[in-house]
Amino acid sequence: LSAIQPLPLMPDCGGLIRTIALALPAAFFAENRATDTVSPLIPIGNLLSALPADITAFIVTDRASLGSARDWLGSLPASCGTELIPLAGNDGISHPWIQDMFHVRAVDAATEFVLVAEKAIGVSLAEYLGAATTHSDVALAGGNQLVGPDFRLVGHSSLQDDRGIGRNAAIPSQRWRKIQALDGRNIFSFGYRPEYLGKVPVSSDFSTTETCEAEMAGEKMHQCGFHVDQFVSVTGLRSGGRPLLLVADPVAHGGCNTRAATELKRKLDASALWLARQGFAIERNPIPLSPAIDTNKCLPRLYNNVLLENVIRSGQKRPFVWVPHFGDTESLEEFDAMNREIWDRIGFQTIGVAGWSHLSSRNGALRCATKIINRGPDTRL
């Protein structure tokens, strides 16, 4: 008997986005005190206001916040559809990173949520939308997986068994096998080997890099950062026959220590090299390591944390990508512009979404705060 193929995971590229979900903690609706430097509702409101009218956003909030959330939504110049969903039970919402909480598998009208964490949110949404739920038997945060048209890119830390990858690298780890079972697409890993550090050609031209069979990433692999979606974007495009990824290229900014930026750059250069060896085409995009506006900690601005479509909307000339922007609050306009220019150059209509400085101290941005529930078909020929 052949195993029944699971429904495919919702990709990070392809058809037009139809519905997305967000989760807003009660703390976001607390009265802003004059001393508060951050207002997390600003970037969320800007995102909702930047979505086309035919997208519906389902917003989960706890019951006590429903009135405030309704007032706030009413104040936005948003043309997209919005529906508020009260959280089931008495649980609260501890953070807005809905991307991490569950995986969406869907084909046509059949939708299934694979619950990972903060399960009340996935359950409330599924009940409201009539989706099925199942529990994941492996802890894989949505932020540590990018889903391409025919591949998945998973952060190495999620593929490693707790005891490390087995001595015999030819035997996939148990976690690798469980993650593979989530979906029919092949898994590639985001990580680097210590011996790759400092090995990258100065031009960062990976097009000539020898590919290897995606060998089981050996036990000496490390992952840069917490989640792959902090530093890598899937584009849904191919370049020279290889799937094209955007990989962040960090620089120090605003008085941040150049050493921290150089260290992050070494790890991301080495990670880009490993991606190229697995058969990806790589384009680099500049990101600043800059003091967060509330904590002053030097942190990367997550320009790779995007939402995109590859199908062109009616009346448009190019497909849309929504890119987090920071120049409205910090002196980062040039980074906003450089990142827009890169997406424009590879064929997108870039929609900059301002305000993400308000969430940068929490290491998240636009993709982290959203979950795509439904997309139209990828009608590209």
Model-derived regions: residue spans:
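Histidine/cysteine-enriched polar flanking segments
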Residues: L1-L381
